Protein backbone atom coordinates (compact mmCIF):
# COMPACT_ATOMS: atom_id res chain seq x y z
CA UNK A 1 0.00 0.00 0.00
CA UNK A 2 2.81 2.40 0.87
CA UNK A 3 4.50 1.61 -2.45
CA UNK A 4 1.29 2.45 -4.36
CA UNK A 5 0.95 5.77 -2.53
CA UNK A 6 4.60 6.55 -3.20
CA UNK A 7 4.20 5.79 -6.92
CA UNK A 8 1.12 8.03 -7.11
CA UNK A 9 2.98 10.87 -5.35
CA UNK A 10 5.99 10.53 -7.67
CA UNK A 11 3.86 10.49 -10.82
CA UNK A 12 1.72 13.40 -9.62
CA UNK A 13 4.87 15.38 -8.83
CA UNK A 14 6.31 14.72 -12.29
CA UNK A 15 3.08 15.88 -13.94
CA UNK A 16 2.81 19.05 -11.86
CA UNK A 17 6.50 19.98 -12.07
CA UNK A 18 6.73 19.51 -15.83
CA UNK A 19 3.53 21.49 -16.42
CA UNK A 20 4.80 24.39 -14.32
CA UNK A 21 8.37 24.53 -15.63
CA UNK A 22 7.61 24.12 -19.35
CA UNK A 23 8.70 27.06 -21.49
CA UNK A 24 8.19 27.31 -25.25
CA UNK A 25 11.20 27.81 -27.51
CA UNK A 26 11.07 29.26 -31.02
CA UNK A 27 10.36 26.41 -33.41
CA UNK A 28 9.30 25.65 -36.96
CA UNK A 29 5.79 24.76 -35.85
CA UNK A 30 3.25 24.76 -33.06
CA UNK A 31 1.26 21.56 -32.50
CA UNK A 32 -2.06 22.05 -30.72
CA UNK A 33 -3.33 18.76 -29.34
CA UNK A 34 -7.02 18.15 -29.85
CA UNK A 35 -9.74 18.06 -27.26
CA UNK A 36 -13.51 17.65 -27.32
CA UNK A 37 -15.55 19.62 -29.84
CA UNK A 38 -19.19 20.48 -29.16
CA UNK A 39 -20.97 20.23 -32.50
CA UNK A 40 -18.73 22.38 -34.71
CA UNK A 41 -17.16 24.48 -31.98
CA UNK A 42 -14.20 24.02 -29.63
CA UNK A 43 -15.04 23.47 -25.96
CA UNK A 44 -13.55 25.88 -23.38
CA UNK A 45 -10.55 23.55 -22.87
CA UNK A 46 -9.81 23.44 -26.58
CA UNK A 47 -10.39 27.19 -26.99
CA UNK A 48 -7.82 27.85 -24.27
CA UNK A 49 -5.30 25.62 -26.07
CA UNK A 50 -6.08 27.41 -29.33
CA UNK A 51 -5.66 30.83 -27.74
CA UNK A 52 -2.26 29.78 -26.39
CA UNK A 53 -1.20 28.44 -29.80
CA UNK A 54 -2.45 31.66 -31.41
CA UNK A 55 -0.48 33.76 -28.91
CA UNK A 56 2.69 31.81 -29.66
CA UNK A 57 2.08 32.09 -33.41
CA UNK A 58 1.46 35.86 -33.21
CA UNK A 59 4.62 36.30 -31.14
CA UNK A 60 6.68 34.51 -33.80
CA UNK A 61 7.35 31.26 -31.94
CA UNK A 62 6.41 29.17 -34.98
CA UNK A 63 5.58 29.72 -38.65
CA UNK A 64 3.06 26.89 -38.96
CA UNK A 65 0.34 25.58 -36.68
CA UNK A 66 -0.46 21.86 -36.78
CA UNK A 67 -3.94 21.17 -35.42
CA UNK A 68 -4.30 17.56 -34.35
CA UNK A 69 -7.45 15.56 -33.66
CA UNK A 70 -9.99 13.31 -35.37
CA UNK A 71 -13.79 13.45 -35.26
CA UNK A 72 -14.98 11.91 -32.02
CA UNK A 73 -18.39 10.63 -30.92
CA UNK A 74 -20.98 13.41 -30.86
CA UNK A 75 -18.78 15.76 -32.87
CA UNK A 76 -20.04 17.11 -36.21
CA UNK A 77 -16.55 17.77 -37.55
CA UNK A 78 -13.03 16.71 -36.61
CA UNK A 79 -11.25 18.49 -33.79
CA UNK A 80 -8.65 19.60 -36.36
CA UNK A 81 -11.33 21.17 -38.59
CA UNK A 82 -12.90 22.99 -35.63
CA UNK A 83 -9.46 24.25 -34.59
CA UNK A 84 -8.65 25.42 -38.11
CA UNK A 85 -11.99 27.25 -38.35
CA UNK A 86 -11.36 28.97 -34.99
CA UNK A 87 -7.82 30.05 -35.93
CA UNK A 88 -8.91 31.38 -39.33
CA UNK A 89 -11.65 33.41 -37.60
CA UNK A 90 -8.90 34.83 -35.35
CA UNK A 91 -6.88 35.96 -38.38
CA UNK A 92 -4.47 33.09 -39.13
CA UNK A 93 -4.00 32.53 -42.87
CA UNK A 94 -5.21 29.03 -43.74
CA UNK A 95 -1.95 28.32 -45.62
CA UNK A 96 -0.10 28.35 -42.27
CA UNK A 97 -2.42 25.78 -40.68
CA UNK A 98 -1.69 22.08 -41.21
CA UNK A 99 -4.56 19.67 -40.52
CA UNK A 100 -3.91 16.32 -38.86
CA UNK A 101 -7.40 14.88 -38.56
CA UNK A 102 -6.82 11.14 -38.07
CA UNK A 103 -5.54 10.91 -34.47
CA UNK A 104 -7.83 9.55 -31.76
CA UNK A 105 -5.47 9.71 -28.75
CA UNK A 106 -2.32 11.43 -27.54
CA UNK A 107 0.05 8.85 -29.03
CA UNK A 108 -1.58 9.25 -32.44
CA UNK A 109 -1.58 13.07 -32.05
CA UNK A 110 2.19 12.94 -31.70
CA UNK A 111 2.88 10.22 -34.31
CA UNK A 112 0.62 11.68 -36.98
CA UNK A 113 1.78 15.25 -36.30
CA UNK A 114 5.38 14.09 -36.72
CA UNK A 115 4.44 12.78 -40.18
CA UNK A 116 2.91 16.18 -41.02
CA UNK A 117 6.13 17.82 -39.82
CA UNK A 118 8.20 15.54 -42.06
CA UNK A 119 5.89 16.16 -45.04
CA UNK A 120 6.39 19.91 -44.60
CA UNK A 121 10.14 19.85 -43.79
CA UNK A 122 9.61 21.04 -40.22
CA UNK A 123 12.19 19.98 -37.65
CA UNK A 124 10.95 21.36 -34.33
CA UNK A 125 7.70 22.15 -32.59
CA UNK A 126 6.03 23.57 -29.53
CA UNK A 127 3.42 21.22 -28.09
CA UNK A 128 0.37 23.02 -26.68
CA UNK A 129 -2.02 21.27 -24.31
CA UNK A 130 -3.23 21.48 -20.73
CA UNK A 131 -0.40 21.57 -18.20
CA UNK A 132 -1.35 18.18 -16.76
CA UNK A 133 -1.02 16.61 -20.22
CA UNK A 134 2.48 17.85 -21.06
CA UNK A 135 4.64 15.28 -19.24
CA UNK A 136 3.17 12.36 -21.18
CA UNK A 137 3.30 14.42 -24.38
CA UNK A 138 7.00 15.02 -23.71
CA UNK A 139 7.68 11.30 -23.25
CA UNK A 140 5.83 10.50 -26.47
CA UNK A 141 7.72 13.20 -28.38
CA UNK A 142 11.02 11.80 -27.13
CA UNK A 143 9.95 8.31 -28.20
CA UNK A 144 8.93 9.56 -31.65
CA UNK A 145 12.05 11.70 -32.07
CA UNK A 146 10.35 15.09 -32.17
CA UNK A 147 12.50 18.04 -31.09
CA UNK A 148 9.96 19.87 -28.95
CA UNK A 149 9.34 22.40 -26.25
CA UNK A 150 6.04 22.75 -24.41
CA UNK A 151 3.46 25.35 -23.47
CA UNK A 152 0.64 24.45 -21.12
CA UNK A 153 -2.67 26.00 -20.25
CA UNK A 154 -4.74 25.86 -17.09
CA UNK A 155 -8.47 26.56 -17.37
CA UNK A 156 -9.44 28.04 -14.00
CA UNK A 157 -13.08 28.45 -14.98
CA UNK A 158 -13.34 24.66 -15.37
CA UNK A 159 -11.42 23.59 -12.28
CA UNK A 160 -13.32 20.31 -11.87
CA UNK A 161 -12.34 19.30 -15.43
CA UNK A 162 -8.72 20.25 -14.74
CA UNK A 163 -8.72 18.12 -11.59
CA UNK A 164 -10.31 15.17 -13.40
CA UNK A 165 -7.81 15.50 -16.24
CA UNK A 166 -4.94 15.55 -13.77
CA UNK A 167 -6.30 12.49 -11.94
CA UNK A 168 -6.74 10.60 -15.24
CA UNK A 169 -3.20 11.49 -16.25
CA UNK A 170 -1.63 9.66 -13.28
CA UNK A 171 -2.69 6.16 -14.43
CA UNK A 172 -2.07 7.13 -18.08
CA UNK A 173 1.52 8.01 -17.19
CA UNK A 174 1.89 4.81 -15.18
CA UNK A 175 0.63 2.75 -18.14
CA UNK A 176 3.11 4.55 -20.41
CA UNK A 177 6.02 3.72 -18.10
CA UNK A 178 4.93 0.07 -17.79
CA UNK A 179 4.55 -0.33 -21.57
CA UNK A 180 7.99 1.14 -22.26
CA UNK A 181 9.88 -0.96 -19.70
Model-derived regions, located:
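A structural signal for short, hydrophobic/glycine-enriched beta-strand patches
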Residues: 11-166
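Hydrophobic membrane-insertion alpha-helices, especially the h-region
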Residues: 1-11
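A transmembrane-helix-recognition feature enriched in membrane-embedded lipid enzymes
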Residues: 162-181
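Short, Lys/Arg-enriched, disordered terminal segments
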Residues: 1, 89, 121, 180-181
Amino acid sequence: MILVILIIIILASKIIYFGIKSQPQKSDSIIILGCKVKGNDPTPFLRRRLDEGLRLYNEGYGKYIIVSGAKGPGENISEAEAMQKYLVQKGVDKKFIILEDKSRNTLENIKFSKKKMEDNNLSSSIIVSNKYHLKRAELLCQKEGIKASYSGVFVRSHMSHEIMGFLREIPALLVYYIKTM
